[in-house]
Regions:
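Bacterial N-terminal signal peptides that target proteins for export
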Residues: 1-10
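Residue-level detector of transmembrane insertion/anchoring sites
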Residues: 10-11, 156
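Short, Lys/Arg-rich amphipathic segments at extreme N-termini
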Residues: 11-14, 34
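N-terminal signal peptide c-region/cleavage motif recognized by signal peptidases
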Residues: 16-21
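N-terminal, motif-rich segments that launch catalysis or mediate targeting to/interaction with membranes
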Residues: 23-161, 168, 173-306
């Protein structure tokens, strides 16, 4: 999940939310995307990636490909409650907040700040978006002049950011609600005595877990359902194109609570209750976005390391 802009209003809203986490898709979703992608790497690229990751001594995650897809969240949050150096330097990189009522992609990407002369992408401006970072890290992974350490970082960031880009609420914002973090909801078996969760968390984790709790099994099932035609179509386009897809899914599906009834949580707040009708619209989007994320991550890596 993401913690957005420095606006005092947004900070106050997000900090006050219960169940706040610092991940996108949750570990489960990122591992599903990565597992699909790994199965679609060419043998040559798979060997190169295995070699890059084998030299990685970082202990924030397990060393395998799918676990490394969660690394960028772990790194960002490793000093979130202390010095906040890593957190403040990288937290904006996980999303592109396109306002649903007045979409402005360039504004959501902080007007695309260039990398300062002599700076690598992992040391780039803190005010930048996930689309720019995917493009920068892809260029570094492709370049033979990139140092081994920076190439390893580029790979780990790409494993995560391509997944982030496909979570619809990482591509949209509704009047500074931090991509749905400030939208309180109840769902499932949550009764009046429950605490509210938030819409962003619901898309990060709760909907993904409805697909199954064995991430590899879910990934294998989704991967097996991807037709060659879909894989070919999904592999085209640019990160900006993919961001606009996520924006559309957020605007038309994730944020559409118009048909939901309300319930009162234990704190006396009246909030939308997401029922089976909402899930029946949302779950196909979750399946498709996870599948697209896996196909596109593989396409990015296969092209950069061919």
């Amino acid at each position: 999940m993401k913690f957005h802009r420095s606006s005092a209003l947004v900070v106050g809203l997000v900090v006050a939310l219960p169940g706040q986490h610092a991940m996108a898709w949750g570990d489960e979703g990122h591992e599903i995307v990565a597992t699909i992608a790994y199965a679609r790497l060419t043998p040559v690229v798979k060997k190169k990636i295995d070699s890059i990751l084998a030299a990685d001594k970082d202990k924030l995650t397990a060393p395998d490909f799918s676990s490394r897809a969660t690394w960028a969240d772990k790194w960002r949050d490793s000093d979130r409650n202390t010095t906040r150096v890593r957190y403040l330097a990288t937290h904006n990189w996980h999303f592109v907040d396109i306002e649903i009522d007045s979409p402005d992609f360039d504004k959501a990407c902080f007007n695309h700040p260039p990398l300062p002369a002599g700076k690598v992408a992992s040391k780039g401006p803190a005010d930048d978006c996930v689309v720019d970072k995917i493009e920068q890290f892809t260029a570094e992974l492709r370049s033979s002049s990139t140092s081994k350490g920076e190439r390893r970082l580029a790979l780990k960031y790409l494993l995560h950011f391509v997944g982030d880009l496909h979570q619809p609420l990482h591509g949209a914002d509704n009047h500074h609600d931090a991509g749905g973090n400030a939208v309180l909801i109840l769902f499932g078996n949550h009764k009046v005595s429950s605490k509210s969760l938030n819409l962003h968390h619901y898309w990060d984790t709760d909907l993904v877990l409805q697909l199954g709790k064995d991430q590899k099994a879910v990934a294998d099932q989704l991967n097996n359902q991807i037709s060659p035609q879909d894989a070919a179509t999904w592999s085209t386009g640019t990160p900006k194109d993919w961001a606009m897809e996520s924006f559309d899914r957020a605007k038309t599906i994730a944020y559409d609570l118009s048909g939901e009834s309300n319930r009162t949580d234990k704190n006396g707040k009246t909030v939308p209750y997401l029922d089976a009708t909402y899930d029946n619209r949302a779950l196909p989007v979750v399946r498709e976005q996870l599948s697209k994320g896996g196909v596109r991550l593989a396409a990015v890596l296969n092209d950069a390391l061919k």
